[in-house]
Amino acid sequence: IQRIDHPGGVVRALQLTDTHLCRNAGGTLLGMDTDHSLRAVIELVKRERPAVDLLLATGDLSDGGAETAYQRLQGYLAEFDCDSFWLPGNHDERAAMEAVTAGSDCLSREIRVAGWQLLMLDSQVPGEVGGRLGEDELGFLESALVAAKSEGLHSLVCLHHHPVEVGCEWLDEQIVTDADAFFALLERFP
């Protein structure tokens, strides 16, 4: 469990997802320079919401799992004076993420801050586009929610793959395949 000191009150969390940074700066996805796109988002956040208490990077952080992409991401996120926490998406390589973030708490699965428990679930299925939580992640989620309930904490559950259809055919093909088990578990902890 990673604990973040916070004076209480409002916790300002910034979520970034699907940055798809390529192996080299200037790489493109669907014709878009992903480094440039992320830089534009960061500049917008710094202008409009400069106070950030923690940053959640929720998958597809790289487009092919290159360590160089994660190294650049680390540099970009260091512009915020706060902790950042990452989870993998289907385009990420966990081993490369671990290598780049070694010695940090970036890949913590459970974060506690100001009466909140943030849970970073791994819905990645290596080699697959779609997501699945599986017994291990669902077991972790259940244990964490039991603990949060007994300690009077609110919970925020984060994962890369969506558990509900969003009305986009190609994206809905990537839905979490065990979403029913996920929601059945969540319903036990209103």
Predicted features by range, described:
Residues 1-2, 40, 96-109, 141-143:
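Alpha-helical scaffolding within the catalytic cores
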Residues 1-72, 152:
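N-terminal active-site segment of His-dependent metallophosphoesterases
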Residues 10-23, 115-125, 156-160:
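Active-site-proximal beta-strand elements of phosphoester/diester hydrolases
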Residues 15-17, 53-60, 84-90, 122, ...:
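Active-site neighborhood of phospho(di)ester-bond hydrolases with catalytic His/Asp-centered motifs
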Residues 25, 57-78, 93-106, 131, ...:
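Metal-dependent catalytic neighborhoods of phosphoester/phosphodiester hydrolases
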Residues 27-33, 127, 169-175:
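Short glycine-enriched, charge-decorated loop/helix-capping segments at active-site entrances
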Residues 41-54, 131-190:
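His/acidic metal-ligating clusters that form di-metal
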Residues 80-107, 114-119, 123, 127, ...:
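Active-site neighborhood of divalent metal-dependent phosphoester bond hydrolases
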